[in-house]
Amino acid sequence: MAGYLKLVCVSFQRQGFHTVGSRCKNRTGAEHLWLTRHLRDPFVKAAKVESYRCRSAFKLLEVNERHQILRPGLRVLDCGAAPGAWSQVAVQKVNAAGTDPSSPVGFVLGVDLLHIFPLEGATFLCPADVTDPRTSQRILEVLPGRRADVILSDMAPNATGFRDLDHDRLISLCLTLLSVTPDILQPGGTFLCKTWAGSQSRRLQRRLTEEFQNVRIIKPEASRKESSEVYFLATQYHGRKGTVKQ
């Protein structure tokens, strides 16, 4: 069993099963179903036990366990960082807090429109819009060497309820972030972004293929089965000809 799944199982056993009936009183049917599912979710339970800010931490833990994208000494830009779960994982894996004196110390910078509570080992720009050129300049000023080795994006637009529109807006966010990689991402670097499967996914995949040596699609175990959520993992950044700044 993979390490992150062992962690989930152990955490689930520690917390055990609890009735959810009392918490569901006076709620609509849809609210009742959502709350019941949420409280029974092993990743929600594990996040609470392991002090992660939300269950999404296990998505990044799985990706990293399988593909080793984070290691001590790397500089990480976490886009859409609130509430900070991915930054927590990144801080641990790149040794940004310097807890392992025998390993290189990395750096984690999180950016979000929403407020993020402080986290030891991480620097946050918030509220800040990562698609705003002024934010890009601030990012460069904060990053050591004005470069990131890894760009993470768990960004998502506010849902409208119209699936195709939400998909198009998320793809647009990913493409906008990709457009600033020549200024920010170190050659040979890694780009991980969330999207919702749909008609524009191939457009994003083509762009990534033009700029990275390897591109793969990942559906982490912690992604809900009914969700169209997938992640593009692109490694070995080389950019399009003439776009990468050395």
Curated annotation (Swiss-Prot):
Effect of residue 59 to A: Loss of methyltransferase activity. Does not modify mtLSU rRNA (Um1369) but still functions as an mtLSU assembly factor
Expression across tissues: Widely expressed, with highest expression in muscle, placenta, and heart.
Primary subcellular site in the record, as a coarse category: mitochondrion
The protein's Enzyme Commission number: 2.1.1.-
Top EC group: transferase
Domain of life: Eukaryota
Role, per record: S-adenosyl-L-methionine-dependent 2'-O-ribose methyltransferase that catalyzes the formation of 2'-O-methyluridine at position 1369 (Um1369) in the 16S mitochondrial large subunit ribosomal RNA (mtLSU rRNA), a universally conserved modification in the peptidyl transferase domain of the mtLSU rRNA. This activity may require prior 2'-O-methylguanosine modification at position 1370 (Gm1370) by MRM3. Essential for late-stage assembly of mtLSU required for efficient translation of mitochondrial DNA encoded proteins; methyltransferase activity is not required for this function.
Disease as annotated in the protein's UniProt record: Mitochondrial DNA depletion syndrome 17: An autosomal recessive mitochondrial disorder characterized by childhood onset of rapidly progressive encephalopathy, stroke-like episodes, lactic acidosis, hypocitrullinemia, multiple defects of oxidative phosphorylation, mitochondrial complex I and IV deficiency, and reduced mtDNA copy number.
Protein name, UniProt field: rRNA methyltransferase 2, mitochondrial
Gene that encodes it: MRM2
